[in-house]
Amino acid sequence: YRHKGLRETSVNTIMGEIKYKRVMYEVKEEGITKTVYLLDETLKISEEGKASSNLVEKVIETVPVTDSYRKAEEVIDTTTNTSLSHEKIRKIIVKIGDKITNKEKEERKLFDKNQLVAGLKEVTALFEEADGIWINLQGKDRKERLEKNKQKAERENKEFNPKMKIKTELKLHVMYEGWKKEDSRHSLVNKQYIAGIMKPKEIARLRDARVFSQYDESKIKLRATNGDGAKWTKGITAKGGIYQKDQFHIMQEIVRDVPIEYRNIFIELINKKEFEKIQPAIDGLKYELNGEYQAVKKLNKLE
């Protein structure tokens, strides 16, 4: 390292902006000369937006519970002694997201190459939940998808609507070891999340990598996945595991797909846990409705 003198900078913290001087060093690595600020690295000052780690944490906590980056800007401004523009907030989130994405890619890569060290933690069961949220694409992503849709419409000689809404599914996955009682509530034990606009196989491989690197898989006797019935949530079920539709989505489909005068039949069977009677009830209702196509099609979702 070569000492190249002091350089002044500033950093945003939750207590306000702080100005300071730190040494700039010049270092040569593999024939390439670059400058580094060791104090910045020690203090974990992010390069993008010059924000302290505690302010970055505040941004990460704020953005998911606000409607937009502009709203997050307002919240940061009123709950801390500093201010960040909505563009700086966006850059911080993008940078953190890129780091997480790269880390997850590396986990999958090491798992595929059998280079992960097997875990030793012993548990008898692992539980998983999978669901999706459809969101509107914006900016560059929307333009790219619109262009693809336009080309497809031209190939198929169909009409193209440039103002159409472009949606994609944000997939969510959580894995945990069980529940523990805390006062009147139950909290999940060692919950771990995966979230992103990802392919199902990417979620499954990342999940498998984490299970392999944390647990002694020979000791796990039960793998159970709860989902909304979507094809991808069933497809990521662990080998030898069981898949079940969670009660919220079962009730949702009963309300949506079963004629109102018959709903209580199914709700009562579920509440009494008389699950073996549900399929005969579905078959009986199909007969009662005289096999009407649309009604039967909806009832098939309950099977």
Q: For each predicted feature, which ranges?
A:
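Cys/His-rich short segments
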Residues: 1, 6-9, 13-44
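Catalytic center-proximal scaffold of phosphoryl-transfer enzymes
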Residues: 26-303
